[in-house]
Amino acid sequence: MKINKKIFDNGLRLVHNEDTSTQMVALNIVYDVGARDEHPEHTGFAHLFEHLMFGGSVHIPDYDAPLQLAGGENNAWTNNDITNYYLTVPKSNVEIGFWLESDRMLELAFSEQSLEVQRAVVMEEFKQRCLNQPYGDVGHLLRPLAYQTHPYRWPTIGKDLSHIANATLDEVKEFFFRFYAPNNAVLAVTGNISWEETIRLTEKWFAPIPRRNVPVRQLPQEVVQTAERRQT
C-alpha cells in the first residue's frame, strides 16, 4: 500500500492512498481535540461540537443536503483525544466533499438556534446512555478512580449534564477558534482519486484557510497509584 503525505503552508497535514478498485472516495478529517482539552467545569464540549459541526456553515446552511444529492454519506465520533469527521462520496462528485469540509473548518455558522437544537440532542443522549439504563453511570464512577488529576477522569459525553445545559454561544465560539484549524487537523483521503487530483483539490479548498493560534497542550501529570481505589 502506497501512502502519500504532504504538509501545507497553513499546517494542514494530508495523507492519501489511491484505490482504483472502488468507485468511491472517502475523506476523513481528524482534529487534535477531545474531552481531555476541556475545562473540568465545562465538560462535554468536544462531543457537543461534533454535533454542532453538522449545523451548517456560513456558505452551506444545510450540510447534509448537498452531500445526499451527490450520493454521499457522513458521520463523526469523539473520544478523549480526538474528534473525527468522515464522509464517502462517488468519485465523480468528490469535490463536494472537499467543499463541505473546508467551509465548515473556515466559517462554521454559529446561532442560538443551532446551539439549542444540538444541545437538546446531546442532553437526550446523555440521559439515554447514562441515566436511563442499568449501569449507564459506570463510566462516570470508574474514571475518577482510575484518574484523579488527568482529564481522562471524565467521559467524552461530559461529567455532568449541567455543563451542556449551561453552555453559551460565546463559549462554543471560543472552543471552535481554539481548536478547529488547519494546523490542528489531519486530512486523510482514500479511494478512486489520484495523488495529483487530491493535491489540486486540497490546494483549492483547504490551503487558503489561515492558521489559528492553537494552544500548546499542557495536561496535568497523573500521580502514581500506590493504593487500592474502591467505589462503594
Predicted regions and their residues:
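M16/insulysin-pitrilysin zinc metalloprotease superfamily fold
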Residues: G56, T88-V121
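Active-site SXXK
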Residues: G44-S57
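Non-catalytic beta-strand/loop surface segments
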Residues: M1-A35, H59-N93, R129-N184, K204, ...
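Short pre-active-site segment immediately N-terminal to the catalytic Zn-binding motif
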Residues: V33-T43
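Short amphipathic alpha-helices in soluble, non-transmembrane regions
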Residues: W99-R104, I199-F206
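Carbohydrate-associated surface elements
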Residues: N192
